[in-house]
C-alpha cells in the first residue's frame, strides 16, 4: 500500500514546481553552494566522463555480448527489410506490431479528419468574409449612386432642406438586423457545404463497394474457369466421389480377403514355385510404421504356414499385404473423412459451387499425409534406445504410440517437504537394484511405467487406471530455479508441476511466488497438501491411498483436516484459484486438484502419481507426442573430474548422438562445439558418490543427460541447446540461440541509473528482473554467475549519479573475496540471498535507512507550509507564547513563523520573523505537529528567535495579522526531495503555490 500511495503522490505538484526543480537541480547540494565546487566543476566533469568510459570498458563480458547480439539482430532485420525477404516473427511480436499499426492508423485518421475540418472552417470563414465584403460594397455603391442621383435631381431643394437625422435606437436595430441576416447567410453556406461533403463521401463509399463487388465477381469467374478445366481433364472429384472411390477399394479388399473370388493376376502358372512374392514398391524409401506392422504380422502368419496348403500361400500373403495397405489408408484418411462428414451439411445443388474448395481441401490432406509419413520415416530412421514393443492392430493410431515421458517439477516454500516428498516417490519401488526399477538420471529421476503400476496398485479400487506413457521424469532439484530454467521461448518445457503446501502453515510468501511463476508460464499444476501425518492423532498406514487412510481416521482428525483444508482453499481463492480435492473435482480444467500427502508415511503418494499420469495422458497427449526435432535445456554447468566442464541437460524431445555439433548460449557469445561424451550415472546410485558414468552412443527423449564437450566453461544455465543438422546454417543457429538473451536488455534502464543485478541462471535472472520491474526498481546492468571485482566496478559508477542505487542485488551466487573488499572500500552494498523477496526486503530496508539519514541532514531546510490566525497573546516577549488556530497546512516543531506586511509609504513587502517554533501544546499536552481542523480551541505555540530581535506585539504586529511559515526557494526544493516528498500532502503543495505569491518567490 505504501508503494501505491507513493506512486500517487509523485504528481502532487504542478508543472510550475517542476520548472523550479529544473532551475535548482537536486537537493544533493542543498546546504550552501560552495565556491570551490564551481572552480572544480571541470575536474568533476572530467572524472565523471572518465568513470563513464571506465564503465563502458568494464561492461565487457555479459552486457556487451548482449548489446552486440541485439545490434546484430536489429541490423539483420533492417537488411531483410531492404532485401524484401520475409521476416519470421514470434506471436507476441506480431500482436505488438498489429497494435502499434492500429494505433498509428487511428492517429493518422484523426489527424486527417481534424485537418479537413480545419480547412473547411477556414474555407467557410473566407467565403463568408468575401460575401459580407461583397454585400457591403454593393450596398455602399447603391447608396452612393442613389445619393448622387438625388443631388443631381434636386440641388436647390437639398440645399434648402437639411438631411433628416435617424434616431440612435433605430440605427442600432438596423445594424442588428443586418448582422442577423449575415449570420443566417453564413449558416446557410455552411449547411450547403456540409451537405456537399456528405454527398461526396457517400459517392466514394458506393464506388468502393462497387469495385469490391467487381473484383469478387472476377475472382469467382477465374475459379469457375479453373474448375471447368480440371473437370474436363477428369481430375476434379467431389467429396461424394472420393467417398465412393474409397468404399469401392474397401469392398474389393474384402472380396479378395474372403477367398471366394479368383483374380487372374493372382493365379499361379504351371511350374511356378510356391514362394511368397516379394513386395516391390515404386520408390525406394525407408519403411513407415504401417509397413513395419505388416512385416510383424507377416512373420506371425509364417509360423502357421505349415497348416496352410502350398497353393494358397501366395494368394493369402498378397491379400494380407493388400488388406494392411488399405487399413493404413483408411486410418490415415479417417480424420479427413470425419471432418468431411461433419461439414457436408450443404445440399446436392451446392456441390458444383463447392468443387474448388473440395479440391483444395483434398490437396491439403495429401500434403498432411506426406508430412506425417515423413515424420514417421525420420523417427524410424533413428534407432530407438530401447527395443519397442511390436504394434498390434488396435494400437495403430499414432497418438498413443509415440508418447514420451512427461516432465514434472516440484515447487513450494522452504521446509514444506519438497525434497522429502521427492525422496519418498524416488525410494518407493527400488527393489534391491533390480532392472526396470527407478533410474537416477542427470538432474532427474526416471520412473518406468512398471514401477508406477506397482505403486499405484492401491488406487485400483477407487479409479480406472490407464498407462499410455512409457514413464515419468521428475526433476530432482526442487524449487524455482529448476522450473524457471526449463523454458523454451517463454513457454515451459516442464509439462506439469507439483506445488507443495504445508497443511499446518497454509500459503506462505514463496508459495505465492510459485503460483505467480506458474501463472506466467501457463503451466498446469496440482497441489500436494503435505504433512497430513502432523494432524493430531493421525493413524498412519504406510504407502496407502489417502481415501482409504482418511476413512479409517477418527472423527476429530477428519474435522481438523476439513477445517485446515477449508482455510487453505480460501487462501487459494484469494490468489484467484478455484480448488477442490482431486476425487471431488468435476471440472479439472477450471479447478486446481488438491492431493493430501505425507512425505513421512507415503500416504497420498499413489494418489499423486495416479493424478499426474491421468492429467498428462488425457489432457496433454499433443504436448507429449514424440518428435524427432531436438528440444533440450541446460539445467546446470558443472566441473567433473576426468571430463572437465560438463553441462547437465534435460532432453525433452528428439535424439542426441555422440559427435553431434551443438550450439548453446555463452557469456561471451554463442558456443559451438561437438559432443565428446553422453553420460548417465550407474543405475540406482547416488550422484554424490564418485561412481563411474555409463557412456552412450545416443540417447532418446525424455531424459536427463550429462554432456562432455570443449569450451563449455562460459555456458549459460537455463538456455536452449540446438543441434546443427545437415541442412541447418550454423551462423543462423548462433544468432537464434542468443535471441533468448537479447530480450533481457529491455529490462535495463536506458537512463543509466539503477542497481546491478547478478543471478546464477538465466531463469532466475528473468524471474528477478520481472520482480524488480513490478517493484519499480530500475536496473543499470545485469550479469550471470559469481560476482567479481569488475562487476562491483560497474556499481561504483552510481556513487556519483545516484548513491541510493550503488547497490548489487545478487540472487543465489557466490561473491569473490576481492570483490567484497573492494565493495566495502568504495561503500557499495552487496545483498546476496536465495529467495527473491528476501533480496527485496533487504534493499527496501537499506533505501529507507538512507532516506532517514537524508531527512536528518536536511531537516532544518524542510519547512512545511502553514497559515495561522492569532487567537490570544499569552506572553509578548522572552519567550513569546501565543495561542493560534491552524487555518491551512501543518504546523510542526522547528517551523519558522513570520508575518508579511506592506509598508504604507514605500508599498514594499516586509517580512517580520517572529521566531522558530520550540514547542506546541494542546490542552497542556505537548505535540510534535498540528494539522488543520485537528483542534477547535487553538494551540499554544512557544516561539524563540536566536537573534533576539523579535517584533513587538501592538507596535509591529497585531492580532489581526495573518501568520505564515517562512518558506523559501530552498525549502520548496528540499520538500521535493525523495526523503520528504511522501510526507507532503496534495493540499500542502497547493498551499505552497499560494505562498510563493505571498513571499514573491520566483
Swiss-Prot record:
This is Eukaryotic translation initiation factor 5B. Residues 47-57, 155-172, 381-398 have a biased composition (Low complexity). The keyword Transmembrane does not apply. The keyword Magnesium applies. Residues 13-23, 307-342, 352-370 have a biased composition (Acidic residues). Residues 530-533 are annotated as: G4. InterPro entries: EFTU-type (IPR029459), P-loop_NTPase (IPR027417), Small_GTP-bd (IPR005225), T_Tr_GTP-bd_dom (IPR000795), TIF_IF2 (IPR015760), TIF_IF2_dom3 (IPR023115), TIF_IF2_dom3_sf (IPR036925), Transl_B-barrel_sf (IPR009000). Residues 75-111, 120-154, 184-252, 267-276, 297-306 have a biased composition (Basic and acidic residues).
Amino acid at each position: 500500500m505504501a508503494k501505491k500511495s507513493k506512486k500517487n503522490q509523485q504528481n502532487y505538484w504542478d508543472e510550475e514546481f517542476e520548472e523550479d526543480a529544473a532551475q535548482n537541480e537536486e537537493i544533493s547540494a542543498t546546504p550552501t553552494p560552495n565556491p570551490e565546487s564551481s572552480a572544480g566543476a571541470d575536474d568533476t566533469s572530467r572524472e565523471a566522463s572518465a568513470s563513464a568510459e571506465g564503465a563502458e570498458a568494464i561492461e565487457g563480458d555479459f552486457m556487451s555480448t548482449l548489446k552486440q547480439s541485439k545490434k546484430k539482430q536489429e541490423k539483420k532485420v533492417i537488411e531483410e527489410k531492404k532485401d524484401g525477404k520475409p521476416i519470421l516473427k514470434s506471436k507476441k511480436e506480431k500482436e505488438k506490431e498489429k497494435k502499434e499499426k492500429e494505433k498509428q492508423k487511428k492517429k493518422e485518421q484523426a489527424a486527417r479528419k481534424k485537418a479537413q475540418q480545419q480547412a473547411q472552417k477556414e474555407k467557410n470563414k473566407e467565403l463568408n468574409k468575401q460575401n459580407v465584403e461583397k454585400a457591403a460594397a454593393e450596398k455602399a455603391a447603391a447608396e452612393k449612386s442613389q445619393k448622387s442621383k438625388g443631388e443631381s435631381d434636386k440641388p436647390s431643394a437639398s440645399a434648402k432642406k437639411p438631411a433628416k437625422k435617424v434616431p440612435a435606437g433605430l440605427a442600432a436595430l438596423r445594424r442588428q438586423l443586418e448582422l442577423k441576416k449575415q449570420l443566417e447567410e453564413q449558416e446557410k453556406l455552411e449547411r450547403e457545404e456540409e451537405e456537399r461533403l456528405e454527398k461526396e463521401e457517400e459517392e466514394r463509399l458506393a464506388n468502393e463497394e462497387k469495385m469490391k463487388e467487381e473484383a469478387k465477381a472476377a475472382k469467382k469467374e477465374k475459379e469457375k474457369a479453373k474448375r471447368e478445366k480440371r473437370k474436363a481433364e477428369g481430375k476434379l472429384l467431389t467429396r461424394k466421389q472420393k467417398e465412393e472411390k474409397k468404399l469401392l477399394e474397401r469392398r474389393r479388399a474384402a472380396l479378395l480377403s474372403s477367398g471366394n473370388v479368383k483374380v487372374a493376376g493372382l493365379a499361379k502358372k504351371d511350374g511356378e514355385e510356391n514362394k511368397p512374392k516379394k513386395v516391390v514398391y515404386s520408390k525406394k524409401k525407408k519403411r513407415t510404421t504401417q509397413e513395419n506392422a505388416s512385416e510383424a504380422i507377416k512373420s506371425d502368419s509364417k509360423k502357421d504356414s505349415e497348416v496352410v496348403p502350398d497353393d494358397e500361400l501366395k494368394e493369402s500373403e498378397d491379400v494380407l499385404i493388400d488388406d494392411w495397405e488399405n487399413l493404413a489408408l483408411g486410418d490415415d484418411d479417417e480424420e479427413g473423412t470425419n471432418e468431411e462428414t461433419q461439414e457436408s451439411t450443404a445440399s446436392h445443388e451446392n456441390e458444383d459451387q463447392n468443387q474448388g474448395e473440395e479440391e483444395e481441401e483434398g490437396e491439403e490432406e495429401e500434403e498432411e499425409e506426406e508430412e506425417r509419413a515423413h515424420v514417421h520415416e525420420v523417427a524410424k530412421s533413428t534407432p530407438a534406445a530401447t527395443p519397442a514393443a511390436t504394434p498390434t492392430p488396435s494400437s495403430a493410431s499414432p497418438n498413443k504410440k509415440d508418447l514420451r515421458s512427461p516432465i514434472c517439477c516440484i515447487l513450494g516454500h522452504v521446509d514444506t517437504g519438497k525434497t522429502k516428498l521427492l525422496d519418498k516417490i524416488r525410494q518407493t519401488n527400488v527393489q534391491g537394484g533390480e532392472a526396470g526399477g527407478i533410474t537416477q538420471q542427470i538432474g532427474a529421476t526416471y520412473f518406468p511405467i512398471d514401477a508406477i503400476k506397482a505403486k499405484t496398485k492401491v488406487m485400483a479400487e477407487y479409479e480406472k487406471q490407464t498407462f499410455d506413457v512409457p514413464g515419468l521424469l521428475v526433476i530432482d532439484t526442487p524449487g524455482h530455479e529448476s522450473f524457471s530454467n526449463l523454458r523454451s521461448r517463454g513457454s515451459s518445457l516442464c509439462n506439469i508441476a507439483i506445488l507443495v503446501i504445508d497443511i499446518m502453515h497454509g500459503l506462505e510468501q514463496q508459495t505465492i511466488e510459485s503460483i505467480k511463476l506458474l501463472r506466467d508460464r501457463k503451466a498446469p499444476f496440482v497441489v500436494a497438501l503435505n504433512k497430513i501425518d502432523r494432524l493430531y492423532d493421525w493413524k498412519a498406514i504406510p504407502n496407502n491411498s489417502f481415501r482409504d487412510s482418511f476413512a479409517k481416521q477418527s472423527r476429530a482428525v477428519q474435522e481438523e483436516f476439513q477445517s485446515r483444508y477449508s482455510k487453505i482453499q480460501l487462501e487459494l481463492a484469494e490468489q484467484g484459484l478455484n480448488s477442490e480435492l482431486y476425487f471431488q473435482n468435476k471440472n479439472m480444467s477450471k479447478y486446481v486438484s488438491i492431493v493430501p500427502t505425507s512425505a513421512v508415511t507415503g500416504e497420498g503418494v499413489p494418489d499423486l502419481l495416479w493424478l499426474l499420469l491421468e492429467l498428462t495422458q488425457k489432457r496433454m497427449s499433443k504436448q507429449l507426442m514424440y518428435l524427432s526435432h531436438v528440444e533440450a535445456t541446460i539445467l546446470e554447468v558443472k566441473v567433473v573430474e576426468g571430463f572437465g566442464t560438463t553441462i547437465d541437460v534435460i532432453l525433452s524431445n528428439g535424439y542426441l548422438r555422440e559427435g553431434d555439433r551443438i550450439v548453446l548460449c555463452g557469456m561471451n557469445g554463442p558456443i559451438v562445439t561437438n559432443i565428446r561424451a553422453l553420460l548417465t550415472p550407474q543405475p540406482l546410485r547416488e550422484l554424490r558418490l564418485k561412481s563411474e558414468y555409463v557412456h552412450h552412443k545416443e540417447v532418446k527423449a525424455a531424459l536427463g543427460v550429462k554432456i562432455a564437450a570443449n569450451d563449455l566453461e562460459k555456458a549459460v544455465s537455463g538456455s536452449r541447446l540446438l543441434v546443427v543438422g545437415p541442412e541447418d546454417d550454423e551462423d543462423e543457429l548462433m544468432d537464434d540461440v542468443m535471441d533468448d538473451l537479447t530480450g533481457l536488455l529491455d529490462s535495463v534502464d536506458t537512463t543509466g541509473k539503477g542497481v546491478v543485478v547478478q543471478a546464477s541462471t538465466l531463469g532466475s535472472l528473468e524471474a528477478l528482473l520481472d520482480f524488480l520491474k513490478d517493484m519499480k526498481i530500475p536496473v543499470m546492468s545485469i550479469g550471470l554467475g559469481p560476482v567479481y571485482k569488475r562487476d562491483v566496478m560497474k556499481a561504483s559508477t552510481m556513487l556519483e549519479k545516484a548513491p541510493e542505487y550503488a547497490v548489487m542485488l545478487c540472487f543465489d551466487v557466490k561473491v569473490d573475496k576481492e570483490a567484497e573488499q573492494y565493495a566495502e572500500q568504495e561503500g557499495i552494498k552487496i545483498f546476496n540471498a536465495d529467495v527473491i523477496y528476501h533480496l527485496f526486503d533487504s534493499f527496501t530496508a537499506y533505501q529507507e535507512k538512507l532516506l532517514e539519514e537524508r531527512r536528518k541532514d536536511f531537516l532544518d531546510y524542510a519547512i512545511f507550509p502553514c497559515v495561522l490566525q492569532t487567537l490570544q497573546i499569552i506572553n509578548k516577549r522572552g519567550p513569546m507564547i501565543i495561542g493560534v488556530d491552524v487555518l491551512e497546512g501543518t504546523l510542526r516543531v522547528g517551523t519558522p513563523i513570520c508575518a508579511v506586511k506592506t509598508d504604507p509609504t514605500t508599498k514594499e513587502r516586509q517580512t517580520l520573523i517572529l521566531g522558530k517554533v520550540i514547542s506546541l501544546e494542546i490542552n497542556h499536552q505537548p505535540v510534535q505537529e498540528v494539522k488543520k481542523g485537528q483542534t477547535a480551541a487553538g494551540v499554544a505555540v512557544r516561539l524563540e528567535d536566536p537573534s533576539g530581535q523579535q517584533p513587538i506585539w501592538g507596535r509591529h504586529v497585531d492580532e489581526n495579522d495573518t501568520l505564515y511559515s517562512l518558506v523559501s526557494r530552498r525549502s520548496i526544493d528540499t520538500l521535493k526531495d525523495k526523503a520528504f516528498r511522501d510526507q507532503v500532502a496534495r493540499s500542502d503543495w497547493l498551499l505552497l503555490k499560494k505562498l510563493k505569491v505571498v513571499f514573491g518567490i520566483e
